[in-house]
Amino acid sequence: MDFFKKEILDWSVYLSLHYIARVCSNSSTSHIIQDYNLIRTYEKVDKTIVDFLSRLPNLFHILEYGENILHIYSMDDANTNIIIFFLDRVLNINKNGSFIHNLRLSSSINIKEYVYQLVNNDHPDNRIRLMLENGRRTRHFLSYISDTVNIYICILINHGFYIDAEDSYGCTLLHRCIYHYKKSESESYNELIKILLNNGSDVDKKDTYGNTPFILLCKHDINNVELFEICLENANIDSVDFNRYTPLHYVSCRNKYDFVKLLISKGANVNARNKFGTTPFYCGIIHGISLIKLYLESDTELEIDNEHIVRHLIIFDAVESLDYLLSRGVIDINYRTIYNETSIYDAVSYNAYNTLVYLLNRNGDFETITTSGCTCISEAVANNNKIIMEVLLSKRPSLKIMIQSMIAITKNKQHNADLLKMCIKYTACMTDYDTLIDVQSLQQYKWYILKCFDEIDIMKRCYIKNKTVFQLVFCIKDINTLMRYGKHPSFVKCTSLDVYGSRVRNIIASIRYRQRLISLLSKKLDAGDKWSCFPNEIKYKILENFNDNELSTYLKIL
């Protein structure tokens, strides 16, 4: 069979281990017996051997042992030969005999003796023996046995196994040890990692994601200074992964002060930028003053992108760091983007409450209007943040900002009704409100009536002839049409939908009064030769430019 051909012996271990690992990762141990078919039984297998196999739980949990009989299960008949080859030819388990013919099975046998005999066994089908005699290297074997005992690794390394063998993801055993590092078992992991490092495992070898073992050591929650220093001796301190993060980026993100200090002292690039434009300094500033001081005291001048760094601090609500950098003159919070966004607007956008309070207390200007028409008030409503809304209103925003805010709010159909009511309640009490109402633009002030969605539904259910009251108030652009229905009982009833309903009635009354003035003045002017030649639309456009007092004055004169 193909699996027994000499030219593919070098791949056999990889195939078998890869298959078993894949099957194990997709199945739970509680369903092994139900999901797998019994494919081979081995008799007279000593429990010591089973204990040894159990040291590879990711590979050998598809086995059952009882009464000196080892039962092997598989659910994929097409790959059965791979498992059989691994057990029969690699581990030399004989189907009807003992585990290894020259291995004395006794209660005193230990794993070390077993491994030595496994490596040095003269059996003609000994997979490891054949590989060593032919000077071959298995490219994938070590990468799948990270859960085995360290003595096994040492023996294999001493017999010429390739220490940086890669799996299908480009990971070496050193990669996998760091990937699966557990604090609860840190002592055994530390020992194995040291063995690999001291035997020359490549700390700069990249997997398919661009991670080197050294980058992983910096990225993961491993704080062993001894391991870090061993890696640092042979590592490229400015290596990058696929996102162009360097080791210094990761130790700064993890707030590993000692590691940051070591890397900077070794000349790591403090201005290296990842693909998002972030430097290691940006990653470290959110953790407090000690790391900031370390960077500022370095010999290399830091590249500071003011807008980027302030926004980074705002996103993480790092007030302490923000205050310290301001006191050192490193940053400036008084910036405006091309969209007219400020640091206070960013604090509202990112829900950074503590930073917002800090910036407002420094007399920051929060009455900004972005190029898209948004304000800090409208942004707080969009984020559904009542606490920030209360803080902003406590700073007494102007009427201009409140009107612009509510226009922006009503453009967003998902706005929070309660927060909109807060805006209306604040705005309606301002004494100069009437002076800003443009009676020609009732449509622009629909937010004034949109205080309660339940009452809006009532408007949609009330009909005047073939139109709903909602259509008349918000959809009809012809003022004359609106005036025709102004006295209808259903329309008048809806003016009570707002606690300030009198204002709605006053607006409608003002529209009627103004139209009457324009109509009267136009008739008076028609007596003149030239005025009568103008179309009515032009006449109205001209007269619309006068306020009510001017219209009344001209009427009296004429």
Curated annotation (Swiss-Prot):
Signal peptide stretch: none
Keyword Disulfide bond among record annotations: no
Entry keyword annotation includes Repeat: yes
Alphabetized InterPro entries for the sequence: Ankyrin_rpt, Ankyrin_rpt-contain_sf, PRANC_domain
UniProt ANK repeat ranges: 65-95, 169-205, 209-239, 243-272, 276-304, 339-368, 372-401
Function: Contributes to viral release without involving rearrangement of host actin.
Entry's family note: Belongs to the orthopoxvirus OPG189 protein family.
Protein name per the record: Ankyrin repeat protein OPG189
Gene for this chain: OPG189
